[in-house]
């Protein structure tokens, strides 16, 4: 098993419903350590930059509008096979298809407002972490 880091967002819908603590509890209960975290209210430019890979897709404008509609939590999680572990905790992108007990099944209302984002690969995690955090902001958890 490999110790990895992954990137996570708690989206505006889940922040507005005060689910931050419950979601953090899910991460930690699953063995993922939070090594960096901050609350942000994304600008349009930040959201467009982060989601640039989707800029030609029909849902891009709605995605940017949603992600700038309120505060978000961004965090870096660390643990064994963190990318896969985090995605399993999140559940399917569409909460209607998410397994019971996953974050999206429990806290999301729709595929558009689906509570959370997680990196889909180590390469994505590295890029997404660097978008929001400097190396100095990452705090190794040795205890």
From Swiss-Prot:
Keywords: ATP-binding, Cytoplasm, Kinase, Magnesium, Metal-binding, Nucleotide metabolism, Nucleotide-binding, Phosphoprotein, Transferase. The keyword tRNA processing does not apply. One of its GO terms (molecular function) is nucleoside diphosphate kinase activity. PROSITE patterns: NDPK, NDPK_LIKE. It holds the Pfam family NDK. One of its GO terms (cellular component) is cytoplasm. GO terms for biological process: CTP biosynthetic process; GTP biosynthetic process; purine nucleotide metabolic process; pyrimidine nucleotide metabolic process; UTP biosynthetic process. InterPro entries: NDK-like_dom, NDK-like_dom_sf, Nucleoside_diP_kinase, Nucleoside_diP_kinase_AS. The keyword Phosphoprotein applies. It comes from the Bacteria. It is found in: Cytoplasm. The active site is at residue 117. It catalyses: a 2'-deoxyribonucleoside 5'-diphosphate + ATP = a 2'-deoxyribonucleoside 5'-triphosphate + ADP; a ribonucleoside 5'-diphosphate + ATP = a ribonucleoside 5'-triphosphate + ADP. Its EC number is 2.7.4.6. Its cofactor is Mg(2+). ATP binds at residues 11, 59, 87, 93, 104, 114. PANTHER family: NUCLEOSIDE DIPHOSPHATE KINASE (PTHR46161), NUCLEOSIDE DIPHOSPHATE KINASE DDB_G0292928-RELATED (PTHR46161:SF3). Belongs to the NDK family. Homotetramer. Major role in the synthesis of nucleoside triphosphates other than ATP. The ATP gamma phosphate is transferred to the NDP beta phosphate via a ping-pong mechanism, using a phosphorylated active-site intermediate. This is Nucleoside diphosphate kinase. It comes from Shewanella oneidensis (strain ATCC 700550 / JCM 31522 / CIP 106686 / LMG 19005 / NCIMB 14063 / MR-1). The gene is ndk.
């Amino acid at each position: 098993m490999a110790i990895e880091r992954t990137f996570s967002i708690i989206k505006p819908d889940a922040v507005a419903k005060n689910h931050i603590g419950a979601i953090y509890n899910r991460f930690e209960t699953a063995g993922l350590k939070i090594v960096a975290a901050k609350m942000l209210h994304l600008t349009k430019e930040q959201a467009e930059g982060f989601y640039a890979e989707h800029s030609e897709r029909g849902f891009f404008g709605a995605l940017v509008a949603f992600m700038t509609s309120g505060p978000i939590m961004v965090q870096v999680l660390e643990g064994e096979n963190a990318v896969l572990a985090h995605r399993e905790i999140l559940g399917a992108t569409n909460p209607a298809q998410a397994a019971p007990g996953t974050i999206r099944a429990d806290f999301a209302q729709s595929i558009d407002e689906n509570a959370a984002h997680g990196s889909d690969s180590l390469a994505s995690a590295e890029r997404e972490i660097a978008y929001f955090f400097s190396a100095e902001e990452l705090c190794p958890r040795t205890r």
